[in-house]
Amino acid sequence: MLTADIPPNQSIYIKHINEKIKKEELKRSLYCLFSQFGRLLDVVALKTPKLRGQAWVVFTEVTAASNAVRQMQNFPFYDKPMRIQYAKSKSDYVTKAEGSFVPKEKKMKQEEKVERKRHAEETQQPSMPNGATTQNGMPVPPFQPSGQDTMPPNNILFIHNLPIETNSMMLQLLFEQYPGFKEIRMIEAKPGIAFVEYEDDVQSSMAMQALQGFKITPQNPMVVSFAKK
């Protein structure tokens, strides 16, 4: 519920989270779930005894945080309904993080460093995951048309360009928001791809249009198309 004595701000506080979830998986899942509302500055989740089952998500805009609080209240996250409110203050979130806050400028430099490293690794490989090739050491844009994109509409979606650490729960949190969702299918031997089944092709089309290009990580916009049948 919205807490009357805490003014709306860009940071939200989440509790009643399943404590068995590993820290990095939890942060990825929260990023995946809440980035639909707007750009995120940070996701903080700690596994210290006092802070288990809690997390903080920081948006760039207060309106995004407000939408998240309203729409995700009691959302079943890893089998437990989330309790969400505005964080007491941004400084409170930083304090709770026990010094883990990274200033925006420093964080941007770190992201640039990671991106340079990723490109360097790609230049040493003849191809990228999911079959995408490289051109002059740079990845091919993920939305280039392929035969998969021209499949006739049906109730099963083919998802690729996923981070290799993506799991079925992370995808379910996204796709079950749309009517007719049935199941997620992933192939262990082929990380980075998944199949999502809906009851009919109208419902699968709605989900595809809504989630096309959704970024599970800043470097991985999802590519969604109809599956071959």
Curated annotation (Swiss-Prot):
* SUPFAM superfamilies hit by this protein: RNA-binding domain, RBD
Claim: Nucleus is one of the keywords in the record: yes
Instruction: List, for all copies, the residue spans of the domain called RRM.
Output: 10-89, 155-229
Q: What does this protein do?
A: Involved in nuclear pre-mRNA splicing.
The record's principal subcellular location, in a coarse class, is nucleus
Which ranges are annotated Polar residues under compositional bias? 123-137
GO cellular component terms, alphabetically, are:
Cajal body; cytoplasm; nucleoplasm; spliceosomal complex; U2 snRNP
InterPro entries for this protein: Nucleotide-bd_a/b_plait_sf, RBD_domain_sf, RRM_dom
Designated name of the protein: U2 small nuclear ribonucleoprotein B'' 2
Q: Which family does it belong to?
A: Belongs to the RRM U1 A/B'' family.
Q: Which organism is it from?
A: Arabidopsis thaliana
Q: Which UniProt keywords apply?
A: Cytoplasm, mRNA processing, mRNA splicing, Nucleus, Repeat, Ribonucleoprotein, RNA-binding, Spliceosome
Q: Does the keyword Translocase apply?
A: no
Any one GO biological process: cold acclimation
Q: Where does the UniProt annotation locate this protein? A: Nucleus, Cajal body; Nucleus, Nucleoplasm; Cytoplasm
Write down the SMART domains for this protein, in alphabetical order. RRM (SM00360)
